[in-house]
Amino acid sequence: MAKKTVEALGAADLKGKRALVRVDFNVPLDESGQITDDTRIRAALPTIGMLTGGGARVILVSHLGRPKGFDDQLRLTPVAKRLGELLGQTVYKADDVIGPEVEEAVKKLEDGDVLLLENVRFYPEEEKNNPEFAQKLAGLAELYVNDAFGTAHRAHASTEGVARYLRPAVAGLLLQKELEYLGKALESPERPVLAIMGGAKVSDKIQLIQNMLTKVDSILIGGAMAYTFLKAQGVDVGASRCETSTTKKDGTTVDLLQLALDLLAEAKERGVTFLLPVDHRTNDKFGDLADPPVTPDANIPEGQMALDIGPKTEELYVAEVQKSGTVIWNGPMGVFELPGFSKGTFAVAHALAESDNLSIVGGGDSASAAEKAGVVDKLSHVSTGGGASLEFLEGKTLPGVAALDEA
């Protein structure tokens, strides 16, 4: 799925042209409205710099949070200020997304200028992918760049609808990097390929596991989702969090214990190594312990809840990482936010950092864990989109990517 990128545009495509750029500036704010982590703003700098350097007039569009209509707390004013500091130039800020005032602000732009529109989700038309709203957005510019991988799995007006009315429509540098790394891991990886899956709910990762079984040589399971697989095989899970069924959107119930057995059987049939924890670190309640007890085997005693993989499992999983050519990591091995139960997740993170394989970390919790372990700069690629990377790895088409011009 090769898409045309911003790098493919020539000087004539950029100089003096108005470029509408969808970025992901959905950054965390504290109670006083200060940005607590500007990673997502920094991630967009290469694309913005390339466009302004080429003389384009850049119009940025992003969402922030989940507003219900206009909400002063979720205006993009602090983002414009921080972006200006990072770019070393004034970033103009519009008080709206569409309308006469915005059109006036766009008219005033000179080559190399940057204008940030207000939070696009102030308009319910954005998430409804309303064609008129998309058309009004498209009317502001002469070319469209999508650099927001984090929302590429959403068919919204600013991510998908706008590309119907504005050409060229190309991928920004960040989106291009995401597609290259994730695409390589799925289509032409260095073997053997290992998928590390973790997190609390197996129901969130069913499609991911199903798709991975057709792509990888081995799978490691950690986190609370491992207890579903263990319980399905008759292992005692004590008081651990263990999902046994889930309800689909159509109201039907899925027996997750049976599904776990089916997935294990499919792995065996396909010759995929499927590893589960052989020991655990536990507590008698959900909370931290400086030196948690370790189970002698996979069984978890009554009244105890497993909150992390144990040292034997760590060794097993680290060895698997070391012999793999490509590793896709999606989800922590335990409750890594609690220091006493962070060892399993951090052991995996450090093993990835120290090996010379292609290591790809799906966004969300795994990205936070990699950051907390201090290994982000030693990994091949840490995705900026949790939901988007998950859907891409599940084999789904991302609407925000499908809408762009073919290379």
Curated annotation (Swiss-Prot):
One cellular component term from this protein's GO annotations in UniProt? cytosol
Which reactions fall under this protein's catalytic activity? (2R)-3-phosphoglycerate + ATP = (2R)-3-phospho-glyceroyl phosphate + ADP
Write out the GO MF terms.
ADP binding; ATP binding; phosphoglycerate kinase activity
Q: What is its EC number?
A: 2.7.2.3
Q: Does the record carry Protein biosynthesis as a key word?
A: no
Q: Which UniProt keywords apply?
A: ATP-binding, Cytoplasm, Glycolysis, Kinase, Nucleotide-binding, Transferase
Please indicate which superkingdom the organism of origin belongs to: Bacteria
Q: Which GO terms describe its biological process?
A: gluconeogenesis; glycolytic process
State which pathway it belongs to.
Answer: Carbohydrate degradation; glycolysis; pyruvate from D-glyceraldehyde 3-phosphate: step 2/5
Question: Which Gene3D superfamilies does its entry note?
Answer: Phosphoglycerate kinase, N-terminal domain
Which InterPro entries does the UniProt entry name for this protein? Phosphoglycerate_kinase (IPR001576), Phosphoglycerate_kinase_N (IPR015824), Phosphoglycerate_kinase_sf (IPR036043)
Q: Write out the residues that bind substrate.
A: 24-26, 40, 63-66, 121, 154
Chain segments annotated as transmembrane: none
From the Swiss-Prot or TrEMBL record, state where the protein is found: Cytoplasm
Xref: Pfam families = PGK (PF00162)
Q: Where does ATP bind?
A: 205, 337, 363-366
Query: Assembly and partners?
Result: Monomer.
Q: Which family does it belong to?
A: Belongs to the phosphoglycerate kinase family.
Name of the protein: Phosphoglycerate kinase
Name its species: Gloeobacter violaceus (strain ATCC 29082 / PCC 7421)
Q: What is the lineage of its organism?
A: Bacteria, Bacillati, Cyanobacteriota, Cyanophyceae, Gloeobacterales
Tell me what gene encodes this.
pgk
